[in-house]
Amino acid sequence: MRKLIFITIMLCITGAFSARAQRYDRGFDLNSSTFVEKGTWMVGGKVGYSTHKNDNYRFLVIEDINSTGYRFTVSPMFCYMIRDNLGLGMRFGYGRNLLSIASANINIESVGINVKDYFSLSHDFSAMAVYRNYIPLGASKRFALFNEMQLAYGVGEAKIIDGHGTNIVGSFEKSHSLSLGINPGMIAFINDHVAVEFNVGMLGLQYSNVNQTHNQIYNGNRDATQINFKVNILSLGFGLAYYL
């Protein structure tokens, strides 16, 4: 009986080691095809602009919204391929956001809140180190997936004003942020050198600090840490890139 138990245990251990020793082949090798060659430079970027205007608009419990605003962003980038399908580079970003609310009313049962003459203007700058890995789709030289890891540092300023005439209150903010993010995407060449890229923010860790001065008298400070492990549909991005 002891011999039978011993033999059974040895067979289980041997089978486990044999299973681990065997490599399961799914039929593709990431190094079998070169999508972007070593020594290639990539220069690209993104530009975005959006604007809105509300005239007596209603959204859920917010009524009589009269507001205007816009958002402008630009993000140039360069990358050098240190190996086939593998590159290191830098990305820079600038954003400007303006929101002006002439009036808006919030009505929740018997509670009413009125917002009038609200103005906000903010600027933000960022610089990030980029590590990009291309994943060829078979032997295709036109389409591929890529994964971009970003380590970024950003600074920003914001001005907030509320009121009109002599009854005006205002705040000034300075912010600093440090983030680590993963942005997978897809690339498609439209000719030998120009490509269109699509990417989405999926994974991120961010720390931010905001220092606020209210009415040039009162000071406040806020620290925040955020971790995201999900697809962020608000960070969908399109861009153009030139490879040379």
Residue ranges and their predicted role:
Residues M1-F28, L244:
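Bacterial Sec-dependent N-terminal signal peptides
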Residues A21-Y80, L88, I233-L244:
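Short glycine/proline- and aromatic-enriched beta-strand/turn motifs that initiate or cap beta-hairpins
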Residues G39, P76, E109-S110, P184:
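Short coil/turn motifs at helix boundaries and re-entrant loops, enriched in small/polar
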Residues G39-W41, T68-V74, F119-A127, F143, ...:
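Residues that define the transmembrane beta-barrel architecture of outer-membrane proteins
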Residues V47-Y49, C79-G165, V231-L244:
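Gram-negative (and chloroplast) outer-membrane scaffold detector with strong preference
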Residues N54-V61, S100-E109, E157-I168, N209-I217:
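Outer-membrane beta-barrel translocator domains and adjoining extracellular loop/strand segments
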Residues Y57-D64, V111-S120, Y134, G165-F172, ...:
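Extracellular loop and loop/strand-boundary signature of outer-membrane beta-barrel proteins
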Residues G185-L244:
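Predominantly the C-terminal beta-signal and adjacent terminal strand-loop region
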